[in-house]
Amino acid sequence: MRYEYVPLKDQYEKEIVPALMKEFNYKNIHQVPKLVKIVINMGIGEGSRNYDLIERHANELAKITGQKPIVTRARKSISNFKIRKGMPIGLKVTLRGARMYNFLYKLINIVLPKVRDFRGLDPNSFDGRGNYSFGLSEQLVFPELSPDEVRRIQGMDITIVTTAKTDQEARRLLELFGMPFKRG
């Protein structure tokens, strides 16, 4: 395995772990919460009728994450949405390891500052088990995509999965990484 310098992982090991151990009085280093994975989900409503649309968004998501997305399919038929079981309805990428840390770094330092009218992430979007989810309304905020090659603006959901037992621990972990939460 080749060695790759990952700035956020280095910061986690040298600064964040000691700070969390002191703040939450952990006895063992393995009690300290850490990032497990980041899941990026892009639901494509018209994807079931237009396979070219799924291909285009799959290429965009691959450029953004550096990893090929998988196509998510409908689990059951819903006649009101004109969806049959097995139809493609979205794309999903699960990032772990160095790609996860690099994506989080890019998200915090490049992408979120480019979002229009951004006043911070909602601190109440934790799920009760230490995982954080939020949505982006357009994919154009990522530097890998140029406005000329994007034909249709599409949002995405991003879920950050941690080993934290409580939302308070997870929020503090993400704050130490530099995640911009709303104050108040």
UniProtKB/Swiss-Prot annotation:
One of its GO terms (molecular function) is tRNA binding. Disulfide bonds: none annotated. GO terms for cellular component: ribonucleoprotein complex; ribosome. Keywords: Ribonucleoprotein, Ribosomal protein, RNA-binding, rRNA-binding, tRNA-binding. InterPro entries: Ribosomal_uL5, Ribosomal_uL5_bac-type, Ribosomal_uL5_C, Ribosomal_uL5_CS, Ribosomal_uL5_dom_sf, Ribosomal_uL5_N. GO terms for biological process: translation. Signal peptide: none annotated. Part of the 50S ribosomal subunit; part of the 5S rRNA/L5/L18/L25 subcomplex. Contacts the 5S rRNA and the P site tRNA. Forms a bridge to the 30S subunit in the 70S ribosome. Belongs to the universal ribosomal protein uL5 family. This is Large ribosomal subunit protein uL5. It comes from Thermotoga sp. (strain RQ2).
